Amino acid sequence: MHFRPLHDRVLVRRIDAEEKTAGGIIIPDTAKEKPQEGEIIAAGSGGRNEQGQLIPIDVKPGDRVLFGKWSGTEVKIDGQDYLIMKESDLLGVVDKTGSVKKAA
């Protein structure tokens, strides 16, 4: 199945957190927090301003993003868990070089 978000919404796949600490301690599933990092799978065309002009989305499929712990709506598509959220719920884009750039 193919899913295309509408307007300024994005489809995000969570990127799982590390299962071990830096010191080698294994973190059990019950103690893990929901990851706050994910990958953009699909993005809508953008929102509209008061004049009706299209405001394009700043993220694209493949971007790694950070978001709030309680952001988005959890959905299951083809057995895979995803989040659907507005672009404004994203905190920023993680650059592959390790630096962070701001999203709109």
UniProtKB/Swiss-Prot annotation:
Q: What induces it?
A: By heat shock.
Tell me a GO biological process for this protein: chaperone cofactor-dependent protein refolding
Q: Where in the cell is it found?
A: Cytoplasm
Give a yes or no for keyword Cytoplasm in this entry.
yes
Output the SUPFAM superfamilies linked to this UniProt entry.
GroES-like (SSF50129)
Q: Name one GO cellular component term.
A: cytoplasm
Q: Please give the Gene Ontology molecular function terms for this protein.
A: ATP binding; metal ion binding; protein folding chaperone; protein-folding chaperone binding; unfolded protein binding
- The protein's predominant localisation is cytoplasm
> Keyword annotations for this protein?
Chaperone, Cytoplasm, Stress response
Q: Which InterPro entries match?
A: Chaperonin_GroES (IPR020818), Chaperonin_GroES_sf (IPR037124), Chaprnonin_Cpn10_CS (IPR018369), GroES-like_sf (IPR011032)
Pfam families with a match to the protein in the record: Cpn10 (PF00166)
Summarizing the function annotation, the protein's role is: Together with the chaperonin GroEL, plays an essential role in assisting protein folding. The GroEL-GroES system forms a nano-cage that allows encapsulation of the non-native substrate proteins and provides a physical environment optimized to promote and accelerate protein folding. GroES binds to the apical surface of the GroEL ring, thereby capping the opening of the GroEL channel.
Q: Which PANTHER family match?
A: 10 KDA HEAT SHOCK PROTEIN, CO-CHAPERONIN GROES
Kindly state the subunit structure of this protein: Heptamer of 7 subunits arranged in a ring. Interacts with the chaperonin GroEL.
Q: What's this protein's family per the entry? A: Belongs to the GroES chaperonin family.
**Name this protein carries in UniProt:** Co-chaperonin GroES 1
